[in-house]
Curated annotation (Swiss-Prot):
It comes from the Eukaryota. Disulfide bonds: none annotated. InterPro entries: B3_DNA-bd (IPR003340), B3_domain (IPR051442), DNA-bd_pseudobarrel_sf (IPR015300). Keywords: DNA-binding, Nucleus, Transcription, Transcription regulation. It is found in: Nucleus. GO terms for molecular function: DNA binding; DNA-binding transcription factor activity. One of its GO terms (cellular component) is nucleus. This is B3 domain-containing protein At2g33720. Residues 216-314 bind DNA. It comes from Arabidopsis thaliana (Mouse-ear cress).
Amino acid sequence: MKMPPPFSASKTQYLFHDESSENSKKSLVSTTLSLSSCENPNKRKMNSDEVLNISCIPRDYKLTQVERKIARMRNLSYQEKAEDEWYGVSTELTLFKDPWIIKKVFHFASVLDMAPNSVSNTHCLLDTESPENAEESLVSLDLCFYDKTWPHDPNVAYNKPTSEEAINLAWMRTMSKRARKEEEKYYVSTELTLLTVADPWTLKMAMTKSSIGNLYRLVLKASFVDIHILRYLPLDDQMMVKEDSGLAVEVYDHDTDSVHNLALKKWAKSSSFVLVSGWRKCFVDRRGLQVGDVIGMYWDRSESKLHFCVLSRSETMDSAPLPPSP
């Protein structure tokens, strides 16, 4: 058995298998000890059909297992890149890469009417695989107040209300007295107003004979006092309102810019509340209230004060007294 001459390394031993002497090249095993096992890549590649999987860079042998995986990830084959693109992921490490890793084509029939050349500062995405159908895959990223694909035809934008819907809306806008009393009973309101801040007078009432008579009291609705006054008072003040003495409150007159002290208490004969201790003198006589005059009131929660104003006068009087000049 003859030994083939060694390639280039000295002090090299070669082992051959006796039964496969005819294919000695395939059974060649090198036992050479060297810093680099691949001084020449062609020496280790015995067969042209075999793929060279051993790295020929000497520093690769000093890398850890994790560093070798990272180095392999940086040099992906075409098959591995195609597999990453198929699953929508990428294991390739780069300093900067196109952020649009996944490119999809969006087809909108309504986008065909858009003219990209007529709009400035418009970015579009096109399908690179089908440049001949570029208009079909056009997607606009232009910033606007509304989507141009929305229907703008008045007949399409909204449905016209039917006769039944119109009747229901009309019924809600014009409530009957029975419905209003039922809402006042449960302290709720379904009446819609455009702006409530412009009209702060939550209580509006017309003067009657009992309001301006010799009874010296103004009867207030229980719903108004419970919702707008009592719920914002401390518990001690709430108890004082329900007692016979009542709670002392300040009433500010907007017309005359004056403050008057009255007492608010619950009327023993009914569930209503009354303003006493100065109502006749401070408001009826001083303001000259008559039957049919409409007054307005509201409770100021921040100052715990009741506000008063004469909204309209009856036909017997032309106008309310003017406020004093500053």
